[in-house]
Structure formats: structure tokens, C-alpha cells
């Protein structure tokens, strides 16, 4: 096993074969695997509305920008045409977005206390996603692909359905059985 390059270019630290990295958005794939494991066990169905497990996602609204070319012009809301499903979250077509895209939802998310999706939230995923559920969607569920906090909602769903924290579920059900001893939810100092 060989390593190449630098683990830290600024410090001049060389890469080692056993260097540890944050996996960042690769957790999306792991969270999706967790959801599919729960489906295999009959604990949920991807066609289920999210509100079946997280009631705050019931009766959502959708933003209708007053001027689609000007996000600062404000918006009105209309009822969602249907409920957001687990499948919508898996395919990033729920209408949920990220704050950092700078779209019409950015200011609403920030004012509503929704995380930016880049910073660690200290294990408060469900608290944050319940806040998100009370805010309007950017698009009608299932209508538009919009990369966003969908997997964060799925992480909350895994916690609710399994009764375990997401890091514990990952460790007990995925990482340990696969012998992934160097893969952790949080990197120890």
C-alpha cells in the first residue's frame, strides 16, 4: 500500500497509508444505506410520507417567488401538492434545499434556525430538521432535483425509526459488521 502527496500541504505533512480523513458528503451514501436497511427490516417504506415518522413534516407549504428573477422580492406560499416521501428525500426531489445556494429559501432557512449543511450540528440533527419542516419548501415535492438537506432529514428518520443515534446506528449496524475500524461518525482528537 502506497501513499502520495501531502496530508497537510501547508504544514508539509506527508500522506501516510493510514491517514484519517473526514468523509463529508460520503455520509449521504451511508445514511441512504441505513434507510434501505430499515426498509429491508420492514420498519419503513420509501413510499411512506416522512410525516408518518416525523409529524412536523405534515401539511407543508411551498414557496412561490413574487419575482422568480429576484430572490429579494419575497414570496407567497401555497399548500404542497402532496406530502414529501422518503423516496423524495433519497432522490433530492423533496423541495428542501441548502442555505448556501443563495436561492429564495436561504434567508428563510437562516431566520428559521436551519443549519447551513456545512457545519457540524453537535448531534442536533432532529431538532434542526423539525425546524426545517415548519418552513416552506422551495419546490413542489417530487417535481425538481434540488441538492439540499434531504439526507439530514433521512438521518433524523433513521434515529426516530431505529431508536438509536445516527452515529450509534452507523457503528453498530454498518461500520463494525464491515470491519471499518477507522471509520467513525466523529473523529477522536
Model-derived regions: residue spans:
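Mature N-terminal segment immediately following signal peptide/propeptide cleavage
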Residues: 1
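Active-site-proximal loop and beta-strand segments within enzyme catalytic domains
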Residues: 4-146
Amino acid at each position: 500500500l502506497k501513499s502520495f502527496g501531502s496530508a497537510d500541504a501547508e504544514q508539509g505533512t506527508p500522506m501516510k497509508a493510514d491517514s484519517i480523513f473526514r468523509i463529508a458528503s460520503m455520509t449521504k451514501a451511508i445514511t441512504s444505506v441505513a434507510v434501505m436497511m430499515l426498509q429491508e427490516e420492514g420498519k419503513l417504506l420509501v413510499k411512506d410520507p416522512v410525516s408518518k415518522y416525523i409529524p412536523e413534516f405534515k401539511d407543508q407549504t411551498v414557496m412561490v417567488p413574487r419575482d422568480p428573477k429576484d430572490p429579494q422580492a419575497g414570496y407567497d406560499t401555497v399548500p404542497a401538492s402532496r406530502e414529501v416521501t422518503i423516496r423524495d428525500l433519497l432522490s433530492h426531489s423533496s423541495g428542501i434545499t441548502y442555505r448556501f445556494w443563495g436561492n429564495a429559501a436561504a434567508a428563510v432557512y437562516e431566520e428559521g434556525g436551519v443549519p447551513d449543511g456545512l457545519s457540524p450540528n453537535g448531534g442536533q440533527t432532529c431538532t434542526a430538521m423539525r425546524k426545517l419542516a415548519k418552513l416552506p419548501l422551495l419546490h413542489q415535492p417530487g417535481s425538481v432535483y434540488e441538492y439540499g438537506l434531504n439526507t439530514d432529514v433521512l438521518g433524523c428518520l433513521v434515529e426516530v425509526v431505529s431508536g438509536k443515534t445516527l452515529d450509534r446506528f452507523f457503528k453498530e449496524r454498518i461500520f463494525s459488521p464491515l470491519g471499518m475500524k477507522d471509520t467513525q461518525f466523529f473523529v477522536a482528537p
